[in-house]
A protein has these predicted regions:
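Short glycine-rich, flexible loops that bind phosphorylated cofactors or substrates
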Residues: 63-65, 152-153, 170-171, 212, ...
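Conserved motor-coupling elements within RecA-like helicase/translocase cores
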Residues: 137-139
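Switch II (G3) loop of P-loop NTPases
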Residues: 142-150, 311-317
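Hydrophobic anchor at the beta1->P-loop junction of P-loop NTPases
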Residues: 95-97
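Acidic, Mg2+-coordinating active-site environments of NTP-dependent enzymes
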Residues: 33-37, 41, 47-57, 61-80, ...
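ATP-dependent carboxylate-amine ligase
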Residues: 1-32, 36-40, 51, 55, ...
Length: 440
C-alpha cells in the first residue's frame, strides 16, 4: 500500500529481488511505481487483495482502513513498513542510520563506501542515489538502511551497527495532540532512540552531542568528530565541493573531496566513515567512496538553470536543516532567493519562529502555504506561512507569501544570472523547481 512512496517502493524492489511476487496500490501512482514494472492499482479498495497473502502498509495507515480490515478478515499477514525493514536487517550483518537530520545522505555515503570496498551491499534508502541506481539495491553483503526515527516502531529494529547523526525535537506531537508518525513527547522520542541504539552491537554517535552521549552511556559506542575516534582536518568549504583530511586516532585515513557542499556534510561523512570501519571497509575504500559519492536526490540538487540563475532543490524541512542548506547555498557567492514550503501543520505551529530565524540569512524569501501531508491544525496553511513571512520582514529580510503558481511566475520573471533559486521543503515544492527549469 502506498507503493509510490520512496520507502514503500524501495521495499517492493527488494522483495522482488528475492523472488516475491509484488503488487501495489497508491492514491497517486507515479514514476517510482511505474519503474517497478508490477501491477499497481489506483486508489484503495479491499478488492485489491484477491490473490495476496501479505499486506505491507505505511505506519500512518489506521487499523480501521478498509484494506487492513479486509486483510485481517481473510487471515492475511499485515506488516507495517518498519516491521518488514526489521525483518530484512536481521538476516545479515547490517547498519541502520537514524537521526533528525542527515540520515539519507549518511546512508548514501555509507553505501558508496561499501560499493567502493567491493562488499556488495544491500541498500534501503529514503532518497534517490545514482550509484544504486534509485532508492534500493539488492546485494549479498552487509545490509545498510536508513531507519526513520519518525516511526515509533523504529525502536524494535535490530542492526549490527546503529548510527545516530543527531537528535532534535522533530516528529513530536504538541501537548494534548496525537498524530500518526509523531511521538507523544520528546522523552518518548528519546526512549525510542535508546531502544534502537541499545539493540546494536556497535553504536556510532557524534562526540560533540551531549544529548546523544547521555543517551548512549554504557552502550558499546564509537564516537566521531572532534574528540572522537575519527575527525576532519584542513576542512575547505567551496561552492561546489568540500575537501578535508580524514584522520583516525591511529593515523590518517586519506584525503576526501566531497562533491556536496556544506559543513553539515563533513559531519555526515564522518559518521559514514566510522560505520564503514565497523563493517570492515579499508581506509582507502572510505576516502575513495566518499569522494565518489554523487549526492542524493533532493539534497542540494542542482536541477538546472533559468535566466542564468541556478535552480537548486532541497528536502530541508526542519529549522536546523534549513539553516545548514542556506549556509551551503551562500558559499556560492550568489544572491540566494529561497522558495520555502513548510511541511506539516503541527511541525510548523511549533517551529514557525525557528523557521524565520533559520531563513533570515537569505537575500529574499518566498513562503508557500504549508504542505499539510493530510494533517489538521489550529491554523490554516496560509495563516502559518503568513506568520513566517511577516516575522522575516520584522527581522529586516524581504519576504512574502505566495501560492505555488504565483511563486513559479515570480521566479520565472525575476531570475537573474547572479541568483541561486533555492526551493526547500519535504512536500511538492520539488515539482515547482523542475517546472521552472523545464518550462523556462
Amino acid at each position: 500500500m502506498g507503493i509510490e512512496g520512496v520507502g514503500m517502493s524501495a521495499l517492493a524492489r527488494l522483495l522482488m529481488a528475492e523472488g516475491v511476487a509484488v503488487t501495489g496500490c497508491d492514491l497517486a501512482p507515479g514514476p517510482r511505481a511505474r519503474r517497478l514494472g508490477v501491477p499497481v492499482h489506483h486508489g484503495h479498495d479491499p478488492g485489491h487483495l484477491a490473490d495476496e497473502d501479505t499486506l505491507v502498509v505505511p505506519t500512518p495507515v489506521p487499523p480501521d482502513h478498509p484494506e487492513v480490515v479486509e486483510a485481517r478478515k481473510r487471515g492475511l499477514r499485515v506488516l507495517r513498513r518498519m516491521e518488514l525493514l526489521a525483518h530484512f536487517l536481521a538476516q545479515r550483518p547490517s547498519a541502520g542510520v537514524t537521526g533528525t537530520h542527515g540520515k539519507t545522505t549518511t546512508t548514501g555515503m555509507l553505501a558508496a563506501i561499501l560499493l567502493e570496498a567491493g562488499l556488495d551491499p544491500w541498500v534501503f534508502l529514503g532518497g534517490e542515489l545514482a550509484l544504486l541506481p534509485g532508492n534500493a539495491r539488492p546485494g549479498r553483503g552487509p545490509r545498510v538502511a536508513e531507519v526513520d526515527e519518525s516511526d515509533p516502531l523504529f525502536r524494535e529494529v535490530r542492526v549490527s551497527v546503529a548510527v545516530a547523526t543527531n537528535l532534535e525535537a522533530d516528529h513530536v506531537a504538541p501537548p494534548g495532540e496525537r498524530a500518526p508518525n509523531y511521538h507523544e513527547s520528546l522523552e518518548a522520542l528519546r526512549e525510542a532512540m535508546r531502544g534502537f541504539l541499545a539493540g546494536a552491537e556497535t553504536v556510532v554517535v557524534p562526540a560533540a552531542d551531549p544529548g546523544l552521549l547521555a543517551l548512549t552511556e554504557g552502550l558499546p559506542r564509537r564516537l566521531f568528530g572532534p574528540g572522537g575516534e575519527v575527525w576532519a582536518e584542513a576542512v575547505d568549504l567551496s561552492p561546489s565541493c568540500t575537501s578535508f583530511r580524514l584522520v583516525h586516532r591511529e593515523g590518517p585515513l586519506g584525503e576526501v573531496h566531497l562533491r556536496v557542499p556544506g559543513k553539515h556534510n563533513v559531519h555526515n561523512a564522518l559518521a559514514a566513515a566510522l560505520a564503514a570501519l565497523a563493517l570492515g571497509a579499508s581506509p582507502e575504500a572510505i576516502s575513495r567512496g566518499l569522494s565518489r559519492f554523487p549526492g542524493v536526490g533532493r539534497r542540494f540538487e542542482r536541477v538546472g538553470e533559468v535566466g542564468g540563475a541556478w535552480v537548486v532543490d532541497d528536502y530541508a524541512h526542519h529549522p536546523t536543516e534549513v539553516q545548514a542548506t542556506l549556509e551551503a547555498a551562500l558559499l556560492s557567492g550568489r544572491r540566494v532567493r529561497v522558495f520555502f514550503q513548510p511541511h506539516r501543520l503541527l511541525r510548523t505551529q511549533e517551529l514557525w519562529e525557528a523557521f524565520a530565524q533559520a531563513l533570515k540569512g537569505a537575500h529574499e524569501v518566498v513562503v508557500l502555504p504549508v504542505y499539510t501531508a493530510g494533517e489538521r491544525g489550529r491554523e490554516s496553511p496560509e495563516a502559518l506561512s503568513d506568520r513566517i513571512a511577516k516575522r522575516l520582514e520584522d527581522l529586516g529580510r524581504p519576504a512574502r507569501r505566495m501560492d505555488k503558481e504565483e511563486a513559479l511566475a515570480y521566479a520565472r520573471a525575476t531570475a537573474r544570472p547572479e541568483d541561486l533559486l533555492l526551493f526547500m521543503g519535504a512536500g511538492d515544492v520539488t515539482l515547482l523547481a523542475r517546472r521552472l527549469v523545464h518550462e523556462g
